[in-house]
Design a protein with these regions (language model features):
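N-terminal amphipathic/basic leader segments beginning at the initiator methionine
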Residues: 1-9
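Conserved PLP-enzyme active-site core in the AAT-like
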Residues: 8-9, 13, 18-21, 29-30, ...
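Short glycine-rich or small-residue beta-strand-to-loop segments that form or flank ligand, phosphate
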Residues: 21, 25, 52-55
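Long amphipathic N-terminal alpha/beta scaffold segment
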Residues: 33-51, 63
Length: 189
């Protein structure tokens, strides 16, 4: 707890965060110093390349939906390697009929189940080797499934396995309920 608190505090200090960064803006938000600076803080704390922090994202499912629709195009394949994602994504993916789902736009969905509370590394490696996957989704939290959350050690191992086969595939981690429970985040891997 103290380690992560200090990491956040240092990022606030490095970016000189003050009350002026939390003032409202008008118009389209061009030159919104508060938004831009807070996004730098989030990226630094999470050791990410960049971040998108908006009050307009009303839930984690909303943020995931925006990311999926940004990355995936008709003919692309999304692969979940931690089993089925949260039920809230069923309509987004197209597991439940929805005229606005990824499936309705021509995006295919596949999943690989966990094996004894761990990734099925061999199946993942074989599937990724076909070189037709656009995005791999990992749900760290157990969600509604009867399994343990995925440790960062297992996640690091599977990401290295994937990168050894395909360095360009997009790997998206749903880290819901996993923030700040370890010294580092999935974006640090």
């Amino acid at each position: 707890c103290e380690y992560n608190s200090l990491k956040v505090l240092k990022a606030f200090q490095k970016n000189n965060i003050s009350d002026m960064h939390f003032n409202g803006t008008t118009g389209y938000g061009y030159g919104d110093i508060g938004r831009d600076t807070i996004e730098r803080v989030f990226a630094e704390v999470l050791e990410a390349e960049d971040s998108l922090v908006r009050t307009q994202f009303i839930s984690g499912t909303h943020a995931l939906t925006v990311a999926l629709f940004a990355y995936l195009r008709p003919g692309d394949i999304m692969l979940s390697i931690s089993g089925k994602p949260y039920d809230t994504l069923d309509e987004v993916i197209g597991l439940v009929e929805n005229d606005s789902s990824l499936k309705s736009y021509g995006v295919q969905y596949e999943q690989i189940e966990l094996k004894d509370d761990d990734f099925d590394y061999e199946e993942i490696k074989n599937r990724v080797a076909k070189n037709d996957i656009k995005l791999i989704e990992i749900q760290r939290s157990r969600g509604y499934a009867l399994r343990s959350s995925i440790s960062l050690e297992k996640m690091e191992k599977v990401i290295k396995t994937i990168r050894a086969v395909n360095k360009d595939v997009i790997i998206m981690v749903d880290n819901c309920y996993g923030e700040f429970v370890d010294k580092y985040e999935p974006t640090s891997i």
